[in-house]
A protein has these predicted regions:
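Positively charged n-region of N-terminal signal peptides that target proteins for export
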Residues: 1-6
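N-terminal amphipathic/hydrophobic interface segments
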Residues: 22-460
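Bacterial N-terminal signal peptides
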Residues: 7-17
């Protein structure tokens, strides 16, 4: 091996080594080292003529005509491989991004750099990646979008600028995952224990895709979305899509195996669509072949689809559509192992959603209406006997309307084709055993759900 120790200005060094290379691969990066930087060079040539140049004393390098810049404490240039290895306080800058690290390798042939050690990459829009290592691929005619690939569980801070024209400061979203890939200024792909933190929600999953240009995010593989604030909620499912506008989440859709849980309502269905405003749930829609369930501690509603209206995240109305069934605990004055129930083509439940002095209380049922082949079984306190022996009322009709007062049945109105039966226990003074309440009170499943159930048509 032939070793030549040369101490000269880099202008002369470039004149000797770079001119022929510039003609061989004209479309890739041709490095230049500006004069006047005090850089020292040591050139080593092996038996095959391959040259390795050791640079020290601080170096500055550029790709001719490409608007980028590399600085470091020292570097090694491998001419045959067209590769530059930089060590110590490495900085890479270009109009689209800046990258800093402890060490960096720049590959001239494909305009690609590999950074290691305390990597910080900042895009032109302010989004920042931090991690142990990263690969940055510059934009080229063959690769229009820049690309950043970072393993080793990096953290990305996405800057979400205000587009509403109100002059609000930008919000940020933090993404942590085992591997993150960024394309351009708006696309982010994350995989492996993904966590996304926004001012209004926390989202997790094993993989995620985010498109800030279209205010869209998708989470996959056991995803979960948790709303923040005083009235939080949680949504899980097979795949969760998040739609936003002006940095505010508007819709969160989970399918299949949707499960939504809030303070006032729990929903279980194949698909669940949550509508939001001001970081609070306003509406929840559930549907699917497997039937939709709306559950609370004292009530459950089942139907092909369910639409819950809940302004300010307090339930005001629940609509159960097609083959609807609802059951609830009996009145507070009744002790029974059976629950009251109601069925019909549709069931609409109205709640008192006004916020009182006790903001922790749940909305009380105010009215429930079943329409179309309606049936109802409910139990009332028996004035002649103990609480364990209630009066039983079973009615049928086209429409059944039940009004509640203080969570107790006040009136029952049956419209068209009204039939029914009232069963009261025998008086305690007769000594006879009170009449038994039929043990089977649930209506037979005479109507099977259709093979395919379409979601309800609701305004967006």
């Amino acid at each position: 091996m032939k070793v030549a120790k040369l101490h000269f200005t880099l202008v002369l060094f470039l004149a000797v080594t770079a001119t022929t290379k510039a003609q061989e691969i004209p479309r890739s990066c041709d490095l230049e080292f500006p004069p006047g930087t005090g850089t020292r060079a040591n050139v080593v040539t092996d038996a095959t003529g391959n040259r390795i140049t050791y640079l020290g004393g601080g170096i500055v390098a550029r790709c001719i005509g490409q608007g980028n810049k590399l600085t470091a404490d020292s570097a090694q240039q491998y001419e045959s491989e067209r590769r530059l290895f930089l060590v110590g306080n490495v900085h890479y800058t270009e109009p689209r991004a800046t990258v800093t690290s402890r060490t960096m390798t720049y590959y001239q042939n494909d305009d690609h750099l590999h950074a290691e050690g305390d990597v910080v990459a900042v895009q032109s829009n302010g989004s920042t990646l931090r991690g142990p290592t990263a690969d940055y691929y510059r934009s080229t005619p063959q690769r229009p979008l820049t690309r950043m690939f970072a393993p080793g569980r990096p953290t990305v801070t996405l800057v979400q600028k205000d587009t509403s024209g109100r002059g609000r400061p930008p919000d940020t979203a933090h993404v942590v995952a085992n591997t993150i890939t960024m394309e351009g200024d708006s696309l982010v792909y994350a995989s492996g224990q993904v966590q996304i933190t926004r001012p209004d929600l926390l989202a997790t999953g094993d993989s995620a895709f985010m498109d800030s240009g279209h205010d869209f995010a998708r989470l996959m593989r056991e995803p979960s979305v948790q709303g923040k604030g005083t009235r939080a909620f949680t949504l899980t499912g097979g795949v969760i899509d998040v739609y936003s506008r002006n940095r505010q989440v508007e819709r969160v859709v989970a399918t299949p195996k949707g499960h939504a849980l809030s303070k006032d309502l729990e929903l279980v269905a194949d698909s669940i669509d949550l509508r939001m405003q001001s970081n609070q749930l306003q509406r929840a829609i559930a549907w699917g072949v497997g039937r939709a369930h709306a559950i609370s501690p004292d009530r459950e509603i089942i139907a092909d689809s369910i639409d819950a209206i809940m302004p300010g995240q307090r339930v005001r109305e629940v609509r159960a559509l097609r083959n609807a069934y609802a059951e609830s605990n009996p009145d507070s004055g009744v002790v029974s192992s059976q629950r009251d129930w109601m069925s019909g083509d549709t069931i609409v439940a109205h709640f008192d959603s006004l916020v009182g002095t006790d903001t922790s209380s749940k909305p009380r049922i105010r009215e429930i209406v079943a329409e179309g082949n309606a049936r109802s079984f409910y139990q009332m306190k028996n004035s002649k006997g103990p609480q364990t022996e209630p009066t039983v009322n079973y009615v049928r009709g086209r429409i059944i309307d039940i009004i509640f007062e203080n969570a107790k049945v006040a009136t029952v109105t049956v419209t068209d084709k009204a039939t029914g039966v009232l069963i009261e226990p025998a008086a305690a003074s007769t000594g006879e055993k009170p009449g038994a309440v039929p043990t089977k009170t649930k209506p037979p499943a005479t109507v099977k759900p259709p093979a395919v159930v379409r979601p309800p048509v609701v305004p967006l």
